[in-house]
């Protein structure tokens, strides 16, 4: 969840109404007011709505929701005449780029803070900590077009933001705070991505830091926006959100030609949806004109296209609209959840804890007592993490997504240990020892089962630790088991064992293989364990 600081003064200016009305209705569009201060409110927005991560975006949504200004916001984009080229050597490093020229900005301290907060929130929500998307905002009047996105030698020097002296690119990774934070994204490449102007001045070292030359201040009037990354759709989404937020503040947007194609594309997407399906889903009988009116409150363009159809124009910044039901959810929000009739269920029953949840809770308590910290890794992952890095063959039983929107999430997990190793990778610069565990569902052969897994990393982590902690967990859960030699290539030969319960394999434990550690960029040994919780006495049959 992203917590955004909304200035009352700026919010009132952009919405045209008072703060009391805004704060009362703001939670109804998908937010929670965390804290009220004298001059601002800290508001938590759901991560599926990154377009709300700024005062400008929140004000745009509230104007529609309050009926002040409804319908599709239209953003004019005219050509800037500025070109961008992309070095072909970046194809294997960071190949994707979007850009725009934003003119006539009027910055004060509040609006600069809003834009910078939006930038960082997008790095988190869309950019996966800058690895997938990174955003650069530059004072256009300090540099000379055309611009070039190049693969540069690591010895290239420039003055990074907030510094006064030149550093090499390697030096920035070592000495600049942002360099240390994000070095892991680029450090293994022989060349580094740079954005330079026509006079070879460095604008940006994405995804690390901008140059001091292009610093944005209250005197800045014209902006060059660059968005780089590894996923073009995500890059375009971030660019559209930044551009439209600044347009809401009164700026004008101009396109940049990137290898012959104009960016950004702020045209709406068009969908035609069923009124009958929407009414059945939300439980409210609507006509096509009524549904169109509700959608316009949520800042869509909408018009009836027949008695059972509405033609919807989806704003370019609404990256969360991927299915008709996403639109139906917005219809329900506009209708007002407080207006839905309350119905008492016709039958009465008494609930109790499901046995599977009871056993999982018991397992969590045991591992917490052993000093492990609970994680909640995603259910979706990819075969690089699940198979390649673990030295395991791809499994036909793996459930694959037909239309993944990202190469990071293409399959449903069949094991939990690989995802815990990925979490150790993210936290490898933190203090040791690190002991993590997770419980949750895995799917193989279309069968959903619940697993328990743990990993422990420190200089002394070994098979003995894995065995001791596995034995403690199994005994506390009342599992009668035996250990047999395992052939799992993810573990070191001779330091791995299968958990056998009732003559069947129910899990595995051991010391992770050095090749797997290298694949996850881990420098210390790792002890690991995974158990199918169906082996625990009292676990319910499917």
From Swiss-Prot:
Gene Ontology BP terms: phenylalanyl-tRNA aminoacylation
Subunit comment: Tetramer of two alpha and two beta subunits.
InterPro entries referenced in this protein's UniProt entry, alphabetically: aa-tRNA-synth_II/BPL/LPL, B3/B4_tRNA-bd, DNA-bd_dom_put_sf, Phe-tRNA-ligase_IIc_bsu, Phe-tRNA-synth_IIc_bsu_arc_euk, Phe-tRNA_synthase-like_B3/B4, Phe_tRNA_ligase_beta2_arc, PheRS_beta_core
Species, as recorded: Methanoregula boonei (strain DSM 21154 / JCM 14090 / 6A8)
Subcellular locations according to the entry: Cytoplasm
The protein's name: Phenylalanine--tRNA ligase beta subunit
Keyword Isomerase applies: no
Cofactors that this protein relies on: Mg(2+)
Gene3D superfamilies in the record: 3.30.56.10, Bira Bifunctional Protein, Domain 2, Phenylalanyl-trna Synthetase, Chain B, domain 3
Family under the similarity heading: Belongs to the phenylalanyl-tRNA synthetase beta subunit family. Type 2 subfamily.
Top-level EC class: ligase
Alphabetical keyword list: Aminoacyl-tRNA synthetase, ATP-binding, Cytoplasm, Ligase, Magnesium, Metal-binding, Nucleotide-binding, Protein biosynthesis
Residues covered by the B5 domain: 266-342
């Amino acid at each position: 969840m992203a917590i955004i600081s909304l200035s009352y003064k700026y919010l009132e200016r952009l919405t045209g109404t008072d703060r009391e009305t805004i704060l009362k209705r703001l939670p109804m569009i998908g937010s929670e007011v965390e804290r009220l201060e004298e001059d601002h409110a800290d508001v938590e927005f759901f991560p599926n709505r990154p377009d709300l991560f700024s005062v400008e975006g929140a004000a745009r949504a509230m104007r529609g929701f309050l009926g002040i200004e409804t319908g599709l916001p239209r953003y004019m984009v005219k050509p800037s005449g500025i070109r961008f080229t992309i070095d072909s050597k970046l194809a294997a490093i960071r190949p994707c780029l979007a850009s725009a020229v934003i003119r006539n900005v009027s910055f004060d301290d509040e609006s600069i803070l809003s834009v910078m907060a939006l930038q960082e929130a997008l790095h988190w929500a869309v950019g996966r900590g800058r690895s997938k998307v990174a955003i650069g905002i530059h004072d256009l009047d300090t540099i000379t077009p055309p611009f070039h996105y190049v693969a540069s030698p690591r010895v290239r020097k420039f003055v990074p933001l907030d510094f006064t002296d030149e550093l090499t690119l390697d030096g920035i990774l070592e000495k600049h705070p942002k360099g240390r934070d994000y070095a892991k994204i680029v450090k293994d490449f022989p060349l580094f991505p740079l954005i330079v102007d026509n006079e070879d001045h460095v604008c940006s070292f994405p995804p690390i830091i901008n140059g001091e030359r292009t610093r944005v201040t209250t005197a800045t009037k014209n902006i060059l926006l660059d968005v780089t990354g590894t996923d073009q759709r995500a890059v375009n989404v971030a660019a559209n959100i930044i551009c439209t937020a600044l347009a809401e503040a009164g700026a004008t947007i101009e396109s940049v030609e990137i290898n012959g194609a104009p960016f950004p594309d702020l045209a709406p997407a068009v969908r035609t949806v069923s009124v009958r399906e929407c009414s059945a889903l939300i439980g409210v009988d609507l006509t096509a004109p009524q549904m169109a009116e509700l959608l316009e409150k949520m800042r869509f363009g909408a018009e009836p296209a027949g008695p059972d159809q509405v033609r919807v124009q989806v704003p370019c910044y609404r990256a969360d609209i991927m299915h008709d039901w996403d639109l139906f959810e917005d219809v329900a929000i506009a209708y007002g959840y407080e207006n839905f009739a309350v119905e008492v269920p016709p039958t009465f029953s008494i609930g109790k804890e499901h046995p599977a949840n009871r056993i999982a809770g018991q397992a969590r308590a045991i591992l917490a007592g052993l000093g492990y910290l609970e994680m909640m890794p995603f259910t979706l992952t990819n075969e690089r993490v699940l198979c390649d890095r673990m030295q395991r063959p791809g499994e036909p039983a793996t459930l694959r997504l037909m239309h993944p929107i990202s190469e990071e999430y293409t399959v449903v997990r069949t094991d939990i240990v690989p995802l815990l190793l990925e979490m150790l990778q993210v936290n490898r610069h933190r203090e040791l020892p690190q002991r993590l565990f997770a419980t949750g569902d895995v799917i193989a052969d279309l069968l959903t089962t619940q697993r328990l897994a743990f990993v422990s990393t420190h200089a002394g982590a070994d098979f003995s630790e894995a065995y001791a902690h596995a034995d403690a967990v199994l005994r506390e859960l009342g599992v009668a088991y035996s250990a047999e030699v395992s052939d799992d290539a993810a573990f070191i030969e001779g330091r791995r064992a299968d958990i056998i319960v009732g003559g069947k394999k129910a899990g595995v434990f051991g010391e992770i293989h050095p090749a797997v550690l290298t694949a996850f960029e881990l420098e210390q040994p790792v002890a690991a364990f995974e158990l199918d919780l169906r082996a625990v006495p009292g676990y319910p049959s499917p």
